[in-house]
């Protein structure tokens, strides 16, 4: 069973003996863990000797009217799940422990990368992600940290943060873990009704179809996107965004497609009470 710490000073003291030689991995989560989170721990164990999992529903990354109050808190169940995959420590701080003053006077702004995709409709979200991840990095001082690729934009922002703030931390992006029908695993999937859960896999199916169309290069990108948006909307989703970007999240058009080895199709869409995120990498065949 992993050791649980609720205070920064206690966790630091527990980790101090490991600073000299063993590698420490951090897996940041908001709890309500599923198989996708457990796979992050499995990956972390491949790269480190000690694995710390943080469980903290971070208020600074939620906007007005979002689901901060209703987000599931399931600490006991989470710790039991983490025991099955061999996590060593759980850090589950209170809000007061993480933020003596709320909102925190110090902020971390990641620049233009936050102004697109999720950042368009959640303008303060990545500011909150930046401050909490920076605090966790400072508290745990890991050698490696593991994040899921489902939150593709977040992963890109964290890589930028590590580079710009000179953290000596290896960031590992873990492949998306999916249900048998293709739906990307997410704690918010439990918001879906039974009928919505049957519809939800259509999102991934559309991403795969769109990726194939991009590689076939039979139609302009904007035509492909328009048709895909119409299909997704007709299935019952409310689209926040559906966009094609370079792997580095810069803009791409028909003239510049062949300049890149890889593109990514990203989507955020509402279905009932759930906001679903997914993405699909697209390898460009330059011979076509």
UniProtKB/Swiss-Prot annotation:
Catalyzes the condensation of pantoate with beta-alanine in an ATP-dependent reaction via a pantoyl-adenylate intermediate. Pathway: Cofactor biosynthesis; (R)-pantothenate biosynthesis; (R)-pantothenate from (R)-pantoate and beta-alanine: step 1/1. The active site is at residue 37. Keywords: ATP-binding, Cytoplasm, Ligase, Nucleotide-binding, Pantothenate biosynthesis. The gene is panC. This is Pantothenate synthetase. Belongs to the pantothenate synthetase family. Its EC number is 6.3.2.1. ATP binds at residues 30-37, 148-151, 177, 185-188. GO terms for cellular component: cytosol.
């Amino acid at each position: 069973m992993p050791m649980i710490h609720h205070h920064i000073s206690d966790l630091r003291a527990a980790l101090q003996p490991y600073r000299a030689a063993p590698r420490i991995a951090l897996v940041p989560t908001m709890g309500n863990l599923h198989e996708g989170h457990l796979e992050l721990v499995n990956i972390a164990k491949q790269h480190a000797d000690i694995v710390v999992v943080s469980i903290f529903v971070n208020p600074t990354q939620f906007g007005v009217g979002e689901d901060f109050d209703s987000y599931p808190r399931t600490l006991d169940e989470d710790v039991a799940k983490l025991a099955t995959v061999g996590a060593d420590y759980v850090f589950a701080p209170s809000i007061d422990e993480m933020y003596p003053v709320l909102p925190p006077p110090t902020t971390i702004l990641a620049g233009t990368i936050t102004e697109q995709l999720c950042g368009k409709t959640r303008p303060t979200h990545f500011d909150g992600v930046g401050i909490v991840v920076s605090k966790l990095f400072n508290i745990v001082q890991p050698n490696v940290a593991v994040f899921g690729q489902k939150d593709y934009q977040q992963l890109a922002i964290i890589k930028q943060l590590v580079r710009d703030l000179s953290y000596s931390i290896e960031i590992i992006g873990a492949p998306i873990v999916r249900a048998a029908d293709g739906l990307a695993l997410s704690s918010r999937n439990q918001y879906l009704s039974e009928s919505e859960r049957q519809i939800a896999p259509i999102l991934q199916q559309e991403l795969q179809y769109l990726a194939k169309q991009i590689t076939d290069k039979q139609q302009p990108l904007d035509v492909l996107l328009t048709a895909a948006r119409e299909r997704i909307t007709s299935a019952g989703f409310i689209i926040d965004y559906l966009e094609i970007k370079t792997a580095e999240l810069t803009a791409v058009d028909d003239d510049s497609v062949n300049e890149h080895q890889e593109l990514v199709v990203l989507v955020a869409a509402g279905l009932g009470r759930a906001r679903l995120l997914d993405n699909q990498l697209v390898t460009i065949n330059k011979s076509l």
